[in-house]
């Protein structure tokens, strides 16, 4: 008995601060994913507004939404129509007026809000505009358990390890990754998948914002750190890959038991400030 899941990873350019245009483009990608029987679709970091803190930081407050705001309502109808889970990274309002999160919403196949994740490791100029998250939820879907992190989070092994220990069999990392760091992009997700014996995918923007060029090149790796599929560089693309999450449980139990054989009593240094 297998637990196959078909995952669609969206590599798209965004129109700065134009939610309507970006959501219409997202709809097209969702329709394409439905034609390929996708169970889940994930968009890149801040896909509905554009990313650049330098260019649009002061306007984040104007485009921020509640988790169940207009973007959710638009995507929820598509989730129901196509029976597809949707991971949508957007600017989220916090519980404190004026404080924002670089976050995401997760929508179920029947159009319900499953929850949110807020980026915990803020990069550079993000710190001036966003509050860092402080929790690492996992999402129980009908095919398995999914963990989420955003861009810079992927460089911290602790994040994916916590997600794996919480049961994640598939970890998704929507990003806005610049071309100058492509060597890191090519290393991040294979490392995280091998360390945690699970599937890991990077979902990147494509396009230019000011002097920041984002190159796409979505990737998905298996539980041994092997690259299963990748999208081209420099173009919009929908990468679709089917994975069997039963392979994760088998691999963790019988092949390389990294999670079971941790020596947590020796790891005190990990909780100390550097």
Q: Model-predicted segments: where are they?
A:
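Conserved beta-strand and immediately adjacent loop positions that scaffold enzyme active sites
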Residues: 6, 87, 103, 135, ...
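C-terminal beta-strand edge segments of enzyme domains
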Residues: 138-140, 205-274
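CN hydrolase (nitrilase-like) catalytic-core segments centered on the catalytic cysteine
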Residues: 67-87, 155-239
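Short beta->alpha transition motifs characteristic of CBS
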Residues: 49, 105, 116-123, 219, ...
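Active-site catalytic loop in hydrolytic enzyme cores
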Residues: 65-67, 77, 95-169, 174, ...
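Cys-nucleophile CN-hydrolase/nitrilase-fold catalytic domain and related Cys-dependent amidase chemistry
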Residues: 19, 28-110, 178-195
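Short, glycine-anchored, charge-dense loop/turn motifs used at functional sites
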Residues: 7, 106-114, 221-228
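Extreme N-terminal starter segment of soluble prokaryotic enzymes
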Residues: 2-9
